Amino acid sequence: MRKVIPILGILLLSFIILGCLGSESREARLIIFHAGSLSIPLSQVEEKFTKYAQEKLGVKVTFQDEASGSVKAVRKVTDLKKRADIVAVADYTLIPQLMIPNYTDFYVLFATNEIVIAFTNKSKYADEMLKNPDKWYEILSRPDVSFGFSDPNQDPCGYRSVMVMKLAELYYGRPIFKELVEKTTNIYSNGTRIYAPKEIIIKDKRVIMRPKETDLVGLVESGSLDYIFIYKSVAKQHHLSYITLPDDINLGDFNKADFYGRVSITLGSTGKTIKAKPIVYGITVLKNAPNRELAIEFLRFLLGNEGRKIFEDNYQEFLSPPVAFGNVPPEIRRLVEVKD
């Protein structure tokens, strides 16, 4: 009997050790580089997926999120050679332009947005802005008013904000781009072609620039900054006041694509030229993703009903259906429209 007890103890200890090893083998981490404007909806999708993965897949998932401007998110992979599972950007064209074919072989267009001008009741002339939104460019031109946008070289919201001001110049027939951009920064234009130097210099203390658009939210909330160009979804998520811009300039109307396309910007950071177009977000799973199968399962979850509802609850309209290009994984094909 005395011999049996130690043997039983050894067997019990073995089961405990094997059980621990087994549970560790079912843990996984997903690394996501994403646009700052996706932070809130993505975190909510991740929370739901964590429960789903534990219950349905038997996997304990943790997420390593890195929010940045979308250009910077892509360059973490292409220039810095950092490993990630998923890249999600605010301008889908960055994926085919900079990541295919070396880093991924497919991408999905899944959500839309528009540019607005956001502020609070602390902002100078806030009441006037609300009552007379068509005077926005006059208010931003006043010497006691500060405004901001994100860095065009790092963030699509930045280069879109600059293009919105050039489109406004065409739409209103007023020198809006010259007054708000060329006089305050070293960004310049030749006709409808805009050039953003690799190092952008701010020449007027009224103008504030940050790496990504969400970096500007706190400045407006605190009253340190009067107005910002930002995505409508972000303004609503943070309960900011905002004015909408005409469809001809807000980059949110697919019917205005031809008018938008009259304007382009060349980025000093990449050397690439980007035409103004309706805002569409893109997402992909990388070829060398550390947890590629699980990343595709997460993408399937995001594109499904639960993911769609989370995005729409956060004021970000989902494409119906999402549109996919390239070597689309079979796991998501029924959720998307595949195009050549």
From Swiss-Prot:
Residues engaged in binding molybdate: G36, S37, S70, D155, P156, C157, E213, Y231
Cellular component, GO annotation: plasma membrane
Disulfide bonds: none
Gene3D superfamilies from the UniProt entry: Periplasmic binding protein-like II (3.40.190.10)
Signal peptide feature range: 1-22
InterPro entries on file: ABC_trnspt_W-bd_WtpA, ModA/WtpA
Subcellular location: Cell membrane
PANTHER family: MOLYBDATE-BINDING PERIPLASMIC PROTEIN, MOLYBDATE_TUNGSTATE-BINDING PROTEIN WTPA
Function: Part of the ABC transporter complex WtpABC involved in molybdate/tungstate import. Binds tungstate and molybdate.
Subunit structure: The complex is composed of two ATP-binding proteins (WtpC), two transmembrane proteins (WtpB) and a solute-binding protein (WtpA).
Protein name listed in UniProt: Molybdate/tungstate-binding protein WtpA
